[in-house]
């Protein structure tokens, strides 16, 4: 049985863009690579999501991907009473930048318990307070996940909104659901056609094969 390709998969979105170009008899599509179109899709997905969330709206679950299990290592006890500093062994892919912070949505231990997400400053003060010094807190720094808290963690899971969704796993499924709501895909395609392909189509070339300089800039 053949694998079913999701209508909102990355392959389906790329194929749809090329199909529309061919249907429009645009010869420039012959020189356009799938890699370039894919990068535009990631770029405008991030743009649309940022535009949506910077208005203060709730995060659409369709935006979110899960990373992990992610191994973390104890690095020191300095500044963490009764606990440790942890750091992820691997560098994390880039999360989108939002007005209120990063696209890091949630961190969980392997039992599904939520770990508070903050920043480095908040983590520093939390570990010095009487009633919160034994609570875990996680934050991003230099593309790694850092955690402060008791010495019982080894793996965590992360939920977040990545700039490039294909970086969420070593083997991304191009035929699986792409992390964007289906109703946002037409807007994403229109942005690519208007902002990118029109630029390509107006590159100075003489396609009329005549002696006049009638190329539009």
PLM ranges: what are they?
Residues 2-217:
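Glycine-enriched, solvent-exposed interface loops adjoining structured elements
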